[in-house]
UniProtKB/Swiss-Prot annotation:
GO cellular component: cytosol
Cell inner membrane in keyword set: no
EC number(s) given by UniProt: 2.6.99.2
Reaction it catalyzes: 3-amino-2-oxopropyl phosphate + 1-deoxy-D-xylulose 5-phosphate = pyridoxine 5'-phosphate + phosphate + 2 H2O + H(+)
InterPro entries: Aldolase_TIM (IPR013785), PyrdxlP_synth_PdxJ (IPR004569), Pyridoxine-5'_phos_synth (IPR036130)
Compartment annotation: Cytoplasm
Protein name: Pyridoxine 5'-phosphate synthase
């Protein structure tokens, strides 16, 4: 059954805009779980622009579903993950000047480094997912790292300027799923998904989890986190 991981980063973004203590992303995670979230996703960036180390430590103690820690493949972040032991880690690219993650990891271009990071984390019983574009070479390289999962970057699909291009990007995601599954990888997806565009991605064969944040937090500002999550679960089933 397809599951929903709710990314709570942008609750912390609102908090950090005023460098205050509210809203609390930990409280948001509790409400997201009450609304039906199957997991909580949080990205601890190197620049700490939203989530803070303390948030991640408290989430590790309070999340009742599973905690997916998004992070760069750096020594600092690997050490934090080995200490906190999230339920799994998603390795993502980072650039300090970006507004949000702009594309997938270049696994093929950093294969030995990423093999080492994946091995260290999975040897500590922390499954690893690699955030990548739906590209044949990147999917093949991901399998070579021995990571358990990939997360397909859905940004090109979500940002498509018209229906024809959107359908082409959806087909690329479908082919990516098929290739990954044939190589023994498990498949998640996320980035830019909304209540309006999520259903076709949710229907892709073999998809396990969608990680969705900004649109849910945006909706939660108006209707509350529990309802926003419930509505996304409906949208994923084509019932909204």
């Amino acid at each position: 059954m397809l599951t929903l991981g709710v990314n709570i980063d942008h609750v912390a973004t609102i908090r950090q805009a005023r460098r205050t203590v509210e809203p609390d992303p930990v409280a948001a995670a509790v409400l997201a779980e009450l609304g039906g979230a199957n997991g909580i996703t949080a990205h601890l960036r190197e620049d700490r622009r939203h989530m803070q180390d303390r948030d991640i430590r408290i989430l590790r103690e309070t999340v009742r579903t599973h905690l997916n820690l998004e992070m760069a493949a750096t020594e600092e972040m690997v050490a934090i993950a080995l200490d906190i032991k999230p339920d799994y880690v998603t390795l993502v690219p980072e650039k300090r000047e970006e507004v949000t993650t702009e594309g997938g990891l270049d696994i093929a271009g950093s294969l030995e480094k990423l093999k080492n990071v994946v091995d260290r984390l999975q040897s500590a019983n922390i499954p690893v997912s690699l955030f990548i574009d739906a590209d044949e070479a990147q999917i093949k390289a991901s399998a070579e790292t021995q990571a358990k999962f990939i997360e397909l970057h859905t940004g090109k699909y979500a940002d498509a300027p018209n229906a024809e291009i959107r359908q082409k990007e959806l087909e690329s995601l479908k082919l990516g799923c098929e290739q990954a599954l044939s190589l023994g990888l498990r498949v998640n997806a996320g980035h830019g998904l909304t209540y309006i565009n999520v259903y076709p991605v949710a229907c892709l064969p073999g998809m396990e989890e969608l990680n969705i944040g900004h649109t849910i937090v945006s909706r939660a500002v108006l209707v509350g986190m529990e309802r926003a999550v419930r509505e996304m679960k409906l949208a994923m089933r084509g019932e909204l």
